[in-house]
Regions:
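Generic hydrophobic, amphipathic alpha-helix propensity
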Residues: 30, 34-43, 59-60, 80, ...
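N-terminal intrinsically disordered/low-complexity leader segments
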Residues: 1-33, 225-230
Length: 230
């Protein structure tokens, strides 16, 4: 099996669920919106009750749908949880994509690193509950764990390429291995944010947290600000 079913309701099939064959795709505007409502409702239910205690019937009710209609869009609680995890992941890393990793940003400055860090930590703080659940579920759902590892690999690769660009322009320490540095900095940021926002083990203001992590990043790669264009 690719995953462990942690709650018997995940295999529950109500009388009005579609029988056999592939589930219907939400191709119409209404169908797309219904699917979005189910994902939004699932996120709320997971945050309120956790993964193990969340029920498909509660998700359907929160979304204003019948229990059976859920199965036109998702096969199980595990599947919709993965969809929620993907949406949270996109929100969490969008600041890095927009401010640092975009192809339009050739050389990130100190100010850009700080802004990306601020937005990233703000997203982490907002999504702390779901991120804690994703970490929990990834321990027994191999597909959720695979999603996490794939994102880590993708992000590490993109950050490494930024470091290489900086090294070629003599704006970062040329002795650093870009891949190892990117992986280490990513792990540092994620673990620090987890200790801070999920476990409450770090006591500092948001401003101080952003400033200190930014300084760590800049110092780690010996980042020099690009020369301003004339």
């Amino acid at each position: 099996m690719s995953r462990i079913r942690a709650n018997t309701e995940t295999s529950e099939t109500p009388a009005d669920a579609p029988e056999g064959g592939p589930k219907l795709s939400p191709r119409s505007t209404k169908g797309v919106r219904t699917r979005e409502r189910l994902v939004e409702a699932a996120k709320e239910i997971f945050e309120e009750h956790g993964f193990l205690n969340a029920r498909i019937s509660d998700i359907s009710e929160r979304a204003g749908q019948s229990h059976g209609s859920f199965y036109y869009y998702f096969d199980s609680k595990e599947e919709i949880f993965r969809e929620v995890a993907i949406s949270v992941d996109k929100a969490l890393f969008a600041p890095l994509d927009d401010v640092i990793l975009s192809d339009a940003v050739l050389l990130p400055s100190h100010a850009r690193v700080k802004e990306a860090m601020r937005r990233h930590l703000e997203s982490f703080r907002k999504e702390a509950r779901m991120l804690s659940l994703i970490e929990h579920v990834s321990r027994f759902d191999t597909e959720v764990n695979a999603l996490k590892l794939a994102r880590h690999k993708q992000l590490t690769s993109r950050v490494a390429e930024v470091i290489r660009r900086l090294q070629r322009r003599k704006l970062a320490d040329p002795k650093l291995d870009a891949e190892i540095t990117a992986a280490a900095l990513g792990a540092l940021t994620h673990r620090f944010a987890e200790l801070w926002f999920v476990q409450g083990a770090v006591d500092c203001t948001f401003k101080d947290g952003v400033e200190q992590l930014t300084r760590l990043f800049i110092n780690a790669v010996n980042l020099k600000d690009p020369e301003p264009k004339a």
